[in-house]
Amino acid sequence: MELARPCSNFQSDLDFCPDCGSVLPLPGVQDTVICPRCGFSIDVRDFGGKVVKTSVVFNKLGTVIPMSVDEGPESQGPVVDRRCSRCGHEGMAYYTRQMRSADEGQTVFYTCINCKFQEKEDS
C-alpha cells in the first residue's frame, strides 16, 4: 500500500523543489531528480520537452583615458604644507602605500607640485 504524499508547501516551476523551494539540479541519466536539500524526488519524465537556455552577458568595456607622465598618482591628491628640499617650494602632494609588513606603518610619498621632486617618509 502506497502512502499519499502530503501537500506541497510551494506551487512552483520544475526548476524549484515544491517542498523546500531550493533549485533542483538538471535531469541526468537517473530516473528521478532528487532535491539536494530535502530529498524530494520528481520523475524525469515530468521534465519532458523542457528546453534549457543559457546566456552570458559581458559588460561593455569603458573608455580608457591614458594618463600623461605628468599626471601620475604621485602628482595628484591632497597638498600639505611641506617645503621641497630641492627647490624650496612650499606645498607638496602626497599619497601613501603599505610597502612593509602590515604591522608596520605606511610609507608616505611626497611630490613637489613645482619641480616634481619626490621624497618618501616611513611612518
From Swiss-Prot:
Residue positions binding Zn(2+) 1: C17, C20, C35, C38
ZnF bounds (TFIIS-type): 80-120
Function (record text): Core component of RNA polymerase I (Pol I), a DNA-dependent RNA polymerase which synthesizes ribosomal RNA precursors using the four ribonucleoside triphosphates as substrates. Can mediate Pol I proofreading of the nascent RNA transcript. Anchors into the Pol I active site to monitor transcription fidelity and cleave mis-incorporated 5'-ribonucleotides.
Descriptive protein name: DNA-directed RNA polymerase I subunit RPA12
Family in the record: Belongs to the archaeal RpoM/eukaryotic RPA12/RPB9/RPC11 RNA polymerase family.
Motif Hairpin, chain ranges: 103-104
Residues of the signal peptide: none
Keyword list, A-Z: DNA-directed RNA polymerase, Metal-binding, Nucleus, Transcription, Zinc, Zinc-finger
GO cellular component: RNA polymerase I complex
SUPFAM superfamilies: Zinc beta-ribbon
Binding, Zn(2+) 2: C84, C87, C112, C115
Annotated domain remarks: The TFIIS-type zinc-binding beta-ribbon domain contains an acidic hairpin motif (residues Asp-103, Glu-104) that likely coordinates the nucleophilic water and magnesium to cleave the scissile phosphodiester bond and release the mis-incorporated 5'-ribonucleotides.
Subcellular location: Nucleus, Nucleolus
GO process annotations (BP): termination of RNA polymerase I transcription
Record's subunit section: Component of the RNA polymerase I (Pol I) complex consisting of 13 subunits: a ten-subunit catalytic core composed of POLR1A/RPA1, POLR1B/RPA2, POLR1C/RPAC1, POLR1D/RPAC2, POLR1H/RPA12, POLR2E/RPABC1, POLR2F/RPABC2, POLR2H/RPABC3, POLR2K/RPABC4 and POLR2L/RPABC5; a mobile stalk subunit POLR1F/RPA43 protruding from the core and additional subunits homologous to general transcription factors POLR1E/RPA49 and POLR1G/RPA34. Part of Pol I pre-initiation complex (PIC), in which Pol I core assembles with RRN3 and promoter-bound UTBF and SL1/TIF-IB complex.
